[in-house]
């Protein structure tokens, strides 16, 4: 049993809520062992980058907020969070620089306006995402927001859902356009229709097993199930509970739903879901999604005559408390007091009458949060980065803005170019589905370790989903404006995606040959790795980290056995690699962990082979 499972077995994460007032009264040092992690069940996250302070993550189903909620969030951020608010790629917000003493007041104030922070971290169902233009866009098959609300009400605060093997992401949309990256979700309900006699029934097809992290992008696969809106929340619940009861609880980097599906296959998993709900499920209907997407930035006609929604770009998702207060005012003055957050970290204000559009677009706030931004800035998405995240390898948000503005000066793009930044392999910036995806790493330049990225191209979600292909490796961030200029000028991302799909197999792969020892493969040369750094390689399907320390090469498994972070991005110190996420130290020679004696890395032999080395167990 891994350490997180032991922690959950001793005490349910929700139970720490009763201890929060005492911890707030007695201070940070009073928090008992294990409860720092359990606080994540309450959306309260300690951050080593901000010693003595926490991040709080709010649950905002489908990204829908009221003016009153924005005022509450903005006011709390200004008074207790140094005025800083981040919009995430799950349509929710995060407050920074929070003291434990202030947490009870924040929770009470949020509850007053109908918001909670429950189950926004750790092994829970995270915020339900969906099309932010539900009920507004003429491109939807059905309004899916009631399903998102019903499912959220089913699991929030319910201990039946608080001990999953791993985190669980759900997207529910009735829109034809692919604005939610459904293929990256553990469960995705996407619009479909089915003929029943002479009637056409609108509902959802069910996709399962998508992910970005834990070893890379896996496109969610069809469960071959059509579900009607009134039964959709029940089916989502059944899928989650099958995962709860049958998912692995061993190595945390291999226990997402995707791995259970790889082990069982979709047919067996579907049978388990049917057994839980006690009936056979309908076969999938006709997929209604289009091979296009939208970012919701700009002025869009609603299906309601005379009304519009205005999509505002929030650069890298970061706003101030004062900006949220002003946004609340605008939503009331020009709309109906509602704002909606998007998975691209932006915001839309719905229900703006034609007669008020000119006044709204002339508001001073819209010179900062623009409805008509330039192309590169418009498509920019960034995770939190090393500034506040324990897992990140590099700074992302400030870098992303710096690079985007440099590119705008070099190549004024006429349409949006989706450039997504992820600071670590967890992939919170959705880099795998972008035109250009940037994944944080580190490299050496003139003997100095600097921020760098691996560059991916051609990622896409939707009915023709494709994973971005790595085209460049370990590019120093300072060189990115020059390097990316050519890619942005080229701009034929749709053509790249078509070429990627042509390379993908269109027929089932032949059965594997009988198991035998894999022959050694020459995989690495000493000059490929800078002294004091590591590099991830793949040998016979296994991801391995190769390090160069004091002139010697060492090979270990790449994924940290503690929480699954990529060790190749870690620092080397005295013959040990230090995990970039939580600081666990592993001996490069033996794999022994100095931080937790129960953990150990698998090590590999490097055998000289001509100019390079082969990896052997």
Where are these regions (language model features)?
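Rieske [2Fe-2S] iron-sulfur-binding domain
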Residues: 528-617
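Terminal amphipathic helices with adjacent charged low-complexity linkers/tails
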Residues: 97, 101-114, 244-303, 308, ...
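Short Fe-S-cluster ligation motifs
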Residues: 416, 423-426, 447-474, 584-617
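Charge-rich, low-complexity segments
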Residues: 1-42, 180-182, 232, 236-285
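Mobile "lid/hinge" segments at catalytic clefts and subdomain interfaces of large enzymes
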Residues: 162-270, 432-494
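Flexible, glycine/charged-enriched surface loops at secondary-structure junctions
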Residues: 83-87, 122, 158-165, 243-261, ...
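Short flanking/linker segments adjacent to small metal-binding domains or redox-active Cys/His motifs
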Residues: 248, 468-523, 598-617
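Small-residue-enriched alpha-helical segments and adjacent helix-cap loops
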Residues: 2, 6, 25-33, 53-201, ...
